């Protein structure tokens, strides 16, 4: 076997001193020789005479550095060539060459070992962390998260539901009791691994409290319900006289308190001014609550302070105590007091309930008519159009509604009242003749000239608010 017969590129250091070690000699195609080992060099050259890089030197005295060592390799090694050993320190080179020739025999110089090329084994590391039973189980858990908790199938839909830290198909999330789909519900409840809707959960597991004694109510206990309030059967009685109320009895609710019909009528009789007062001033203060004070800024002057448990109707209040305020405006036809107390207009905090009859008595008393006040630009627009047309149609009312921002019903009533006033003035003019001089321009309530449009120029500030039926 020849020396370095494999034609492969070899790494060469730029500094020539790196070639001085034995390791560099093993990889070099032309190991340097010293004067003491000239026979070895000749034998090595003779053993590979056919190779162009190892031809014998023709000179009688072979120098330490042969000329062929500076020649470049063939195309297999590229265009890079070895640097000449002449650039190295000569003394250092001779010393290392002598040691190399002594330590290596002829066979070692001519024999090529495969250890230089195949002695190093490369270890290829796999990509990613090593697999383990724990990582394998984690990947299985990740895959299981994509499965529906209801049917167990993989969720491939674009949208899904997430409830109780699980994923569901939109059609699989149902109540366990009533099988009602919960995809449109805002909340659901879980108990023992089952999903319930709100109604079934409270009916099975919910613990409500009595609105009077505040004690818990079990699911198998009979209760009395009034609106959103729940009472024990024994607690469902009048707050004042403690009369038990059974199915079919009439009662009233004021601030979550139950009253019988008699005491409810007394409570309602003291407040007839407005229904909104019941939300600000609870009726419990009328019965002499210990928190009620005559000097309090929130006390109602129309209410008399009476001891707790004593109820005095408003008609029996002695002289000197403040009387209930009278309602302003024209008098209305009033119903009997015993009926009015249960058919009056009651606000959100008070309600008459007919327990067990299936329907509640609605308010039948007529409320006050709403009064509308117009702004100056609205009056100018309506008066200008009234000068042109006294009876606008639906199309004209729609245009006026867009200009003024008023509803069509309001505009219709205004034109109706304006036409009535204009007719009355025309009849008055026909009966009394011309108006006196110096009276000035009038509004819709009066006319100063014969023309039906002359009152349009009157001051808008004098126009009173109009009544809407």
From Swiss-Prot:
<dbReference type="GO" id="GO:0007451">
    <property type="term" value="P:dorsal/ventral lineage restriction, imaginal disc"/>
</dbReference>
<dbReference type="GO" id="GO:0007517">
    <property type="term" value="P:muscle organ development"/>
</dbReference>
<dbReference type="GO" id="GO:0035218">
    <property type="term" value="P:leg disc development"/>
</dbReference>
<feature type="region of interest" description="Disordered">
    <location>
        <begin position="111"/>
        <end position="141"/>
    </location>
</feature>
<dbReference type="InterPro" id="IPR009057">
    <property type="entry name" value="Homeodomain-like_sf"/>
</dbReference>
<dbReference type="GO" id="GO:0007476">
    <property type="term" value="P:imaginal disc-derived wing morphogenesis"/>
</dbReference>
<keyword id="KW-0479">Metal-binding</keyword>
<keyword id="KW-0539">Nucleus</keyword>
<keyword id="KW-0238">DNA-binding</keyword>
<dbReference type="GO" id="GO:0007399">
    <property type="term" value="P:nervous system development"/>
</dbReference>
<dbReference type="InterPro" id="IPR001356">
    <property type="entry name" value="HD"/>
</dbReference>
<dbReference type="GO" id="GO:0007526">
    <property type="term" value="P:larval somatic muscle development"/>
</dbReference>
<comment type="function">
    <text>Required for the normal development of the wing and halter imaginal disks.</text>
</comment>
<keyword id="KW-0677">Repeat</keyword>
<dbReference type="GO" id="GO:0007479">
    <property type="term" value="P:leg disc proximal/distal pattern formation"/>
</dbReference>
<dbReference type="GO" id="GO:0007419">
    <property type="term" value="P:ventral cord development"/>
</dbReference>
<keyword id="KW-0217">Developmental protein</keyword>
<dbReference type="GO" id="GO:0000981">
    <property type="term" value="F:DNA-binding transcription factor activity, RNA polymerase II-specific"/>
</dbReference>
<dbReference type="GO" id="GO:0048735">
    <property type="term" value="P:haltere morphogenesis"/>
</dbReference>
<dbReference type="GO" id="GO:0036011">
    <property type="term" value="P:imaginal disc-derived leg segmentation"/>
</dbReference>
<protein>
    <recommendedName>
        <fullName>Protein apterous</fullName>
    </recommendedName>
</protein>
<dbReference type="GO" id="GO:0060033">
    <property type="term" value="P:anatomical structure regression"/>
</dbReference>
<dbReference type="GO" id="GO:0046872">
    <property type="term" value="F:metal ion binding"/>
</dbReference>
<dbReference type="GO" id="GO:0007411">
    <property type="term" value="P:axon guidance"/>
</dbReference>
<dbReference type="InterPro" id="IPR001781">
    <property type="entry name" value="Znf_LIM"/>
</dbReference>
<dbReference type="GO" id="GO:0005634">
    <property type="term" value="C:nucleus"/>
</dbReference>
<keyword id="KW-0440">LIM domain</keyword>
<dbReference type="Pfam" id="PF00412">
    <property type="entry name" value="LIM"/>
</dbReference>
<dbReference type="GO" id="GO:0030182">
    <property type="term" value="P:neuron differentiation"/>
</dbReference>
<feature type="DNA-binding region" description="Homeobox">
    <location>
        <begin position="367"/>
        <end position="426"/>
    </location>
</feature>
<feature type="domain" description="LIM zinc-binding 2">
    <location>
        <begin position="210"/>
        <end position="263"/>
    </location>
</feature>
<dbReference type="Pfam" id="PF00046">
    <property type="entry name" value="Homeodomain"/>
</dbReference>
<keyword id="KW-0862">Zinc</keyword>
<dbReference type="InterPro" id="IPR050453">
    <property type="entry name" value="LIM_Homeobox_TF"/>
</dbReference>
<dbReference type="GO" id="GO:0010628">
    <property type="term" value="P:positive regulation of gene expression"/>
</dbReference>
<dbReference type="GO" id="GO:0006357">
    <property type="term" value="P:regulation of transcription by RNA polymerase II"/>
</dbReference>
<dbReference type="GO" id="GO:0045165">
    <property type="term" value="P:cell fate commitment"/>
</dbReference>
<dbReference type="GO" id="GO:0007450">
    <property type="term" value="P:dorsal/ventral pattern formation, imaginal disc"/>
</dbReference>
<feature type="region of interest" description="Disordered">
    <location>
        <begin position="21"/>
        <end position="44"/>
    </location>
</feature>
<keyword id="KW-0371">Homeobox</keyword>
<dbReference type="InterPro" id="IPR017970">
    <property type="entry name" value="Homeobox_CS"/>
</dbReference>
<dbReference type="GO" id="GO:0000977">
    <property type="term" value="F:RNA polymerase II transcription regulatory region sequence-specific DNA binding"/>
</dbReference>
């Amino acid at each position: 076997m020849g020396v370095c017969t494999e034609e492969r590129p070899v790494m060469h250091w730029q500094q020539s001193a790196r070639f001085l070690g034995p390791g560099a000699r093993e990889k070099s195609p032309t190991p340097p020789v010293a004067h003491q080992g000239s026979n070895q060099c000749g034998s090595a050259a003779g053993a590979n005479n056919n190779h162009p890089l190892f031809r014998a030197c023709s000179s009688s005295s072979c120098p330490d550095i042969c000329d062929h060592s500076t020649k470049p390799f063939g195309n297999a090694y590229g265009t890079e060539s070895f640097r000449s050993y002449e650039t190295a320190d000569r003394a250092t080179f001779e010393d290392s060459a002598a040691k190399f020739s002594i330590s290596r025999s002829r066979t070692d110089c001519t024999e090529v070992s495969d250890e230089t090329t195949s002695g190093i084994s490369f270890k290829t590391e796999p990509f990613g962390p090593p697999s383990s039973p724990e990582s394998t189980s984690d990947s299985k858990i990740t895959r299981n998260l994509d499965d529906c908790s209801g049917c167990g199938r993989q969720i491939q839909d674009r949208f899904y539901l997430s409830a109780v830290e699980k994923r569901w198909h939109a059609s699989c999330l149902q109540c366990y009791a009533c099988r009602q789909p919960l995809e449109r519900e805002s909340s659901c409840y879980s108990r023992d691994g089952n999903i319930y809707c709100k109604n079934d959960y409270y009916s099975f597991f919910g613990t409500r409290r009595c609105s009077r004694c505040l004690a818990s109510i079990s699911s198998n206990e009979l209760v009395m319900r009034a609106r959103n309030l729940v009472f024990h059967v024994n607690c469902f009685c009048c707050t004042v006289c403690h009369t038990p109320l059974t199915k079919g009895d009439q009662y009233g609710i004021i601030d979550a308190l139950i009253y019988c019909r008699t005491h409810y009528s007394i409570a309602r009789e003291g407040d007839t001014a407005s229904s909104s007062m019941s939300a600000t001033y609870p009726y419990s203060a009328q019965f002499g609550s210990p928190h009620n004070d005559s000097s309090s800024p929130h006390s109602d002057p129309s209410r008399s302070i009476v001891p707790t448990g004593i109820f005095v109707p408003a008609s029996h209040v002695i002289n000197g105590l403040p009387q209930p305020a009278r309602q302003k405006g024209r008098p209305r036809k009033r119903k009997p007091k015993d009926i009015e107390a249960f058919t009056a207009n009651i606000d959100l905090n008070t309600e008459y309930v007919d327990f067990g009859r299936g329907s509640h008595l609605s308010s039948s008393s007529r409320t006050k008519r709403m009064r509308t006040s117009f702004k100056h630009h609205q009056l100018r627009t309506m008066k200008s159009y009234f000068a042109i047309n006294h009876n606008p149609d639906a199309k004209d009312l729609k245009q006026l509604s867009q200009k003024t921002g008023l509803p069509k019903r309001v505009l219709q009533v205004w034109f109706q009242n304006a036409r009535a006033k204009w007719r009355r003035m025309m009849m008055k003019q026909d009966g009394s003749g011309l108006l006196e001089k110096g009276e000035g321009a009038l509004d819709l309530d009066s006319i100063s000239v014969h023309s039906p449009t002359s009152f349009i120029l009157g001051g808008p500030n004098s126009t009173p608010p109009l009544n809407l039926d």
